[in-house]
Amino acid sequence: MFTHYTGNRQFDLQLNRSLGPILNRPGMDRLTTSVLPRIRSTSQITQFAHRLAAHFNSEGDAAAAWRLYFLAAFYLPEHDPSKRHFIDAASRNFDTSHSHLAMRRHTIPYKDGSLTAIRWQADPDDRARFPDAPSTLVMMNGFDGYAEEIMGFAEYFPCRPFDIITFDGPGQGHTALAGMPLEPRWELPTTAVLDYFDLDSAAALGLSFGGYLVMRAAAHVPRISHVVAFDMMYRLLDGLTLPLPATVRPLAASIVERARPAWLIDATMSVAAHASADLAWKLQQGRHLTGMDKPSDVLRALGAYTMEPLAGMIRQPCLVMAGDANQYVPFERLSDVRRILAGAASLDVRAFTEATDPGMAQHCQIGDPHRAFRIMGDWLVRPAAKPCSTRTRE
């Protein structure tokens, strides 16, 4: 279930994502009903998450602490020393809470730096039950996540007949903190990951902005055997124009796409950011990912991330998840995604509406991640006789 804690859609998305797995902890019901409804700013979210992370850390609950440290870091700019402190604490607690699993970190050489990756070995029993499943699933990060958080999503799979690899590519997570900016040719870091792990074939799943990146990679990397967009992302810049009234979106989109005149874009975006916490965060994150400062330069850089040039280039079987309450991706983009994927070996679309399925209609189906990963897991193990979801995990 997607809970509207604060009434701010962006805040509520992050709170649902981070708090969902730990709502069963003692005292969480009181906090969600008495504290969260009073949150009105990003600084309040940072303070709330930091206090709660420190509490769980002191209690030895690393599984809860790592998620909250990432939430505490989420809205902070990269130059804030607290951000790195929170990220380091999140990584330490993640490692502690997963030390009993067949999971380890890797540092993948890439250009003049390196990519952070985590590999979780397949469950042997699941692999034996589903011999037709891909042997490896590479999960691609998005606009604001870290490799640990993507692996946290992987825990929702009801079974794991495949190794799971998550990584921070250029402009993502730990790699962005190290100063490596985002790059459009996503096939390059993808190839580096496949080469490092000596993989001839792997399925690929992209989360959020990763829903676009996985398509870009699949168009250029034939070693990708299956493609999952969790969920669809046709064009990154849609996330800036979608919150606007529908009547002005086309005009705004044309201005944003051109990012001209630069002086007007810079002035307008700077003023608008003061009135919108959502826009302020998107610009802050865009600067962090691209390494650019002026809003007009950031928009020009982000404009390269669109599926349009990929038409007819993606040949793999594809699964696309979509929801009409997605605050970053217009639901009507589904027709564009279908058109771009017309040459795919197969195309399965799972579309959800807020009227009938409100949790699944949200961005990345965040209101019901167990169900979302059951759907994606079943799709990945086909044509197995029994769906992955028939096995119950404790």
Label each PLM-derived region with a short phrase.
Residues 49, 80, 84-129:
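N-terminal cap/lid segment of alpha/beta-hydrolase-fold proteins
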Residues 149, 179-199, 203:
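Alpha/beta-hydrolase active-site loop
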Residues 153, 316, 330-340:
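Short alpha-helix in the alpha/beta-hydrolase fold that links the catalytic acid
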Residues 157-174:
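Conserved alpha/beta-hydrolase
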Residues 220-299, 321-322:
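Hydrolase active-site cap/lid region
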Residues 338-360:
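Catalytic histidine neighborhood in serine/cysteine hydrolases
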Residues 355-358, 362-394:
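Catalytic active-site module of serine/aspartate enzymes centered on a nucleophile-bearing elbow/loop
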